[in-house]
């Protein structure tokens, strides 16, 4: 008999064995998982919501989990984001993944979510098709040497740096033109001090029109994500340029970002980016 319940930190002991099997999660830890503390680390931080953590328990052991959260949209509605779904390799194809997914959808439906998004590697694509998710677009990974990014000197738009936030700012829990979840995930890494970075807000006549996060990925590269409101669409070039250029303080050589491929039109007028289509697949379902 399998029971679906809210996750607890003590479950991480069992989840270590799950994580050491086949992990279908695009943010998988480099080098894998060898300690319970590493698993606990995945269940902390600014982007983690305790209400959005369910586990599947069978005969006193946790054999799977699903982690999810919600984001606001410009229309005032909400989308749901499945951050990960993992089932012990010995329990796959036993409907546990389906039960976890359905339970998560039920909670998100109660929270007025209208659409759910997950990011899946090709190996797990068939599972999402079976639970009535469908592929929607693709993800483009962009790279550009900082020296090739033109300076945007507009004085109309004011950039505000958020100093030492201790939680995810409301302005960053938002999806419009950025890939859903990407802004909040990178912002959380900065808030949690897992990466060195900056959280930025952009204003036009005291009205918030955009947000950006930039973080030092390694000695040569910084990663950034930007999003804009409906009123900020016409100023997206300034938001992109100012956010990416902030990385010059760390003396990195290039910047990278991942965006929905259909938003390339926002980036291509700025510079000639190196572009590569991600193997990860965005899938979605209307609730």
Q: Over which residues does each language-model region extend?
A:
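Hydrophobic, ordered structural segments
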Residues: 92, 104-105, 113-134
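Conserved acetyl-CoA binding element of GNAT-fold acetyltransferases
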Residues: 76-89, 219-232
């Amino acid at each position: 008999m399998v029971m679906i319940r809210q996750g607890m930190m003590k479950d991480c002991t069992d989840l270590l064995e799950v994580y050491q099997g086949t992990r279908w999660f695009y943010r998988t830890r480099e080098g894998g998982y060898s300690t319970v503390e590493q698993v606990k680390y995945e269940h902390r931080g600014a982007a983690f919501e305790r209400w959005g953590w369910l586990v599947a328990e069978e005969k006193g052991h946790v054999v799977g989990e699903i982690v999810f959260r919600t984001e606001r949209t410009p229309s005032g509605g909400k989308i749901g984001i499945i951050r990960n779904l993992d089932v012990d390799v010995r329990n796959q194809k036993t409907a546990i993944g389906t039960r976890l997914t359905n339970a998560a959808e039920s909670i998100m439906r109660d929270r007025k979510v209208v659409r759910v998004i997950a990011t899946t590697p090709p190996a797990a694509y068939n599972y999402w098709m079976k639970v009535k998710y469908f592929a929607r677009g693709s993800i483009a990974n962009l790279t550009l040497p900082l020296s090739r990014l033109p300076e945007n000197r507009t004085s109309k738009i004011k950039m505000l740096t958020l100093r030492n936030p201790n939680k995810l700012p409301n302005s960053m829990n938002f999806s419009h033109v950025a890939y859903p979840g990407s802004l909040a995930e990178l912002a959380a890494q900065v808030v949690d001090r897992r990466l060195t970075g900056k959280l930025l807000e952009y204003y036009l006549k005291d009205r918030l029109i955009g947000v950006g996060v930039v973080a030092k990925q390694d000695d040569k590269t910084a990663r950034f994500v930007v999003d804009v409101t409906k009123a900020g669409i016409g100023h997206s070039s300034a938001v992109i340029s100012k956010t990416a250029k902030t990385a010059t303080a760390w003396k990195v050589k290039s910047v990278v970002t991942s965006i929905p491929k259909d938003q390339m039109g926002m980036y291509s007028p700025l510079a000639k980016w190196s572009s590569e289509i991600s193997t990860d697949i965005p899938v979605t379902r209307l609730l």
